[in-house]
């Protein structure tokens, strides 16, 4: 296969994975599952798969798509804690844009793809090692998303997040948010 056709093939594969991320983001109850306090997400799954199949750079691009769709989704369909993910939703007790929400919405998602891609690349080999590398990359990618998003929420919006959920940071769930 020539270099040009290999490049085109890779670009098409990345575009298809990005389309899956966008599709999951905007189909109700598919990519974001509303829970009592926050929306659980499955959108990180194609980001991790893309990172495993296409590498850390592609994983970072897919993570960026995930982050941008998260901002859009939380802006057009706000929930109680959407101020953590959209600069257009003011945090309780604040007026005006909250630009730290862009850090929470985008940076961890980019790092999901980068981390998963590098873990896979470092661990992958033949046979069982490849399976282990896929599992490790999936776990690291999921943990990267959860831990960095929750830590960002605690760091930038801890009091507002606790207030939106009627839970002080000193309560056990507030402590869990801090511990993450």
Name each region found by the language model:
Residues 1-180:
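Loop-helix junctions at membrane interfaces
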């Amino acid at each position: 296969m020539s270099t040009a056709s290999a490049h085109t093939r890779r670009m098409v594969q990345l575009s298809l994975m990005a389309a899956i991320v966008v599709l999951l983001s905007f189909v109700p109850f598919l990519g974001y599952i509303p829970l009592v306090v926050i929306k659980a997400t499955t959108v990180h799954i194609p980001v991790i798969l893309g990172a495993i199949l296409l590498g850390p750079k592609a994983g970072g691009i897919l993570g960026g798509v995930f982050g941008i769709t998260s901002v859009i989704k939380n802006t057009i369909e706000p929930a109680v804690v959407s101020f953590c993910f959209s600069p257009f939703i003011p945090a309780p007790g604040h007026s005006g844009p909250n630009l730290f929400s862009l850090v929470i919405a985008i940076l961890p998602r980019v790092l999901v793809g980068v981390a998963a891609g590098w873990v896979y690349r470092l661990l992958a080999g033949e046979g069982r090692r490849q399976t282990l590398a896929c599992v490790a990359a999936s776990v690291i990618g999921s943990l990267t998303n959860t831990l960095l998003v929750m830590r960002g929420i605690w760091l930038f919006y801890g009091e507002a997040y606790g207030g939106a959920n009627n839970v002080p940071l000193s309560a056990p769930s507030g402590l869990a948010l801090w511990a993450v």
